[in-house]
Each structure stands twice: as C-alpha cells, then as structure tokens.
Amino acid sequence: MGKSMKVDDIITFAFKNIKQKRTQSLLTIIGIVIGVLAMVSLISLGYGVQNYIHEEMMKMGSNKITILPMKQFGVPPSHLFTKKEIKAIKNVKGVDTVMYGWYGGCEIEYNGEKKFVSYYYAIPSKLREVYKDSGYDIEEGRWLEDNDKYACVIGYGTAHNLFDREIKVGDVIKIKDKKFRVVGILKQIGNQQDDNSIILNIDVGEKLFGNEGKYNFISVTVKEGEDIEKVSEEIKKALKKSFGDEDFSVLTAEQLAKTVSSVLGVITIFVVGVAAISLLVGAVGISNTMHMSILERRKDIGILKALGAETTDILAIFVVESGFLGLFGGIVGLVLGILLAEVIEALAHKMGYLMVNAWISWELIVGVLIFSFLVGVISGYFPARSGAKLNPIETLRGE
C-alpha cells in the first residue's frame, strides 16, 4: 500500500497546475467572476436599500401607526377609507392625532415644461403634526396653512432637479390648468417619491382630483404612555366593524419597515437567483477544464500512482485545484462587485437617490468566498473522481 501525500504537497501540485496554464485558468474563471460580481453588487445594493428604508421608517417615531386600504403591498385596494372610518379611529382609546388624505401621481407644468410627480393632499396642520419628526422639514419658505387654497409645498427634487429652470418660492406651477403658488420647498429626503412631490391642501386636492370624501391612507399618532400594539389592535377592531372585513393594513413604524423590507428581500433573492445562472455557467466551465486537464495529464497521474500516491491523493489534487479556481474567481468577482456597488451608490447619490446604498459586511465577504470555493470543488469532483481511478500501468503505456 502506498504512502499518502502530505497536505502541503497536494496544495503545491494544485497551484503548480494552475500556474502552468494561466491563460486557460483565467478563461475558466470568467463565468465565476461574472456570477459573483453580479451577486455581490445586487446583494450589497438590495440590503443597502432595505437598511435605509428600515432606518427611515424608524425615524417616523415609535408612536405612529400607518393605515392602508389593502392587505398586501402592490395590491389595488378593494375599497377606500371614508369619514366613517376616520370617525371610528378617532374614537379609539389612546389615539391622539389622525391625519388622512390621498397620494398618487400627476403631471405638473412649469415654465412651459411638463413633468410627472407624486402628490399628497391632507389637512396641513395634521400633516405637520404627524410628520414633524420624520425628516419633512422646510428648506425654504413655509408650510401650508389650513386656510391656504391655491398654494403648495414642493419636494427638493421638484424644485431643483426636474425642470430646466429651478422653481423658487413664489413661483407659479400648473396642475390640470389650475395655478398654484409655491409657498415652501422641502429639504432633501432621499427617495424620489418624496423628493419629486407636491403637497396640497385637502380641500383643493379633493376637488382637483375628484376623490371627495375618499382617502387611501391614514396616519395616526398615539398618546404618550399608551401601548402602541394595543392601540393598533383596537384600531383593527374598529375598522373591521366599519368595513365588515379585514382588507386593510394597520402597521406600526417597525411593522411597516419589516413589511417593506420583506418585499424588497423577495425581489433581491429573485434577482440574485437570476444572476446565479452565471455561476452555473462558470461551474460548467470549471468542470470541462478539469476534464480536459485530466486527459492531458494521464501520464502524470500514472507516475504519481507508481511512486505510491493513493487514489484519494489524486482526487484531492484535482478537487483542490478546481476549488482554488472557484476561489480565485470569487475573489476577483468580489472585488469587482464591491467596486460596482460603490460606483452605483455614488452615481445614485449624485442624482438624488439617497436610498441607494452599498451594504458590505464580513458575513457577505466570507460567505461569497466560501461559496465560490465550494462551487469549484463540486464542479471538479466528478472529473477528478474519474481521473483518480485511472490504471497507472495503462496511463504510463499511453493507453
């Protein structure tokens, strides 16, 4: 029986084989590089956006509840809120302020240009009270007053980025041919929906968009000292009694953050799954390379076996070699993926998309490298197993 090779000898053989065919090795790992690059950049940006949204939601305050007329995000509401539901919520013990209104999208005109923005309308004093600690701060001008009619507050992006000429406080914009004077401009919030927005008084908004007496969002603040979870459950009971079903969502800031994060998480996993196809292509490339390498080195295998190397030693040499190919591809892909994520973050921030952030952690780095190594090992295992079983006498004869 032969003597087993040392671990460092196995690693040396594997490295030597890779170095001897550098060009072939580089071509082999391209698929792994592309797959890891795509996965790292997408995971980094996906979790970066989730973390940003979670932080922003938590800034809303631990005493705020958001109520939406649908059970799941992205599903059209089967019915809308009315004054009946508003009254039912106001009567719930522990409720302090109830702010209600409508959000949607519309076209606005300024200086002959037309652009699409998101719009919100609500009672101005209630809006200020509910969102006073949530980053909705005035950069220039003032907030809307309850008696303002054809006046508006616009988002940072609407004022500074959308039009060729910046909108100033006092300028006039048009919505559905109605003129509105800009009385205030919000500070930059970091997401396009809020930054590219316009806020109107509820009295004007209802008539302008034809939604009188109907509302697609309600925000509630809970009195100090009250249990927000208990108040949330009481609101659910009141709405169920009013609606007759449970086709609505009552979410605290933490629940809202978790819900949005879970939706984004599913999207991230799907996109990463698509990117993983490149890794599969890379794995096939490594497998083919190892198969060709074994055919080319039949005599080397025969010599090693004749010198006493065991079948497990030959298997280990080729498995380690394929594992290192996967690892090298993973390292290159990881570095390029991080750089790509950082570049996208910088460009997004320059364009005003502050929610786009690159999230890099040691868990991601170590996980990607281990995964890449395992992909290489698995890809090379079956060709290596067939090579390890070769008969040394036949290989030395060149058969």
UniProtKB/Swiss-Prot annotation:
One of its GO terms (molecular function) is transmembrane transporter activity. Keywords: Cell membrane, Membrane, Transmembrane, Transmembrane helix, Transport. It is found in: Cell membrane. It comes from the Archaea. GO terms for cellular component: plasma membrane. InterPro entries: ABC3_permease_C, MacB_PCD, Macrolide_Exporter_MacB. The chain crosses the membrane at residues 26-46, 266-286, 301-321, 324-344, 358-378. It is a multi-pass membrane protein. Pfam families: FtsX, MacB_PCD. Belongs to the ABC-4 integral membrane protein family. PANTHER family: ABC TRANSPORTER PERMEASE YTRF, MEMBRANE COMPONENT OF TRANSPORTER-RELATED. This is Uncharacterized ABC transporter permease MJ1507. It comes from Methanocaldococcus jannaschii (strain ATCC 43067 / DSM 2661 / JAL-1 / JCM 10045 / NBRC 100440).
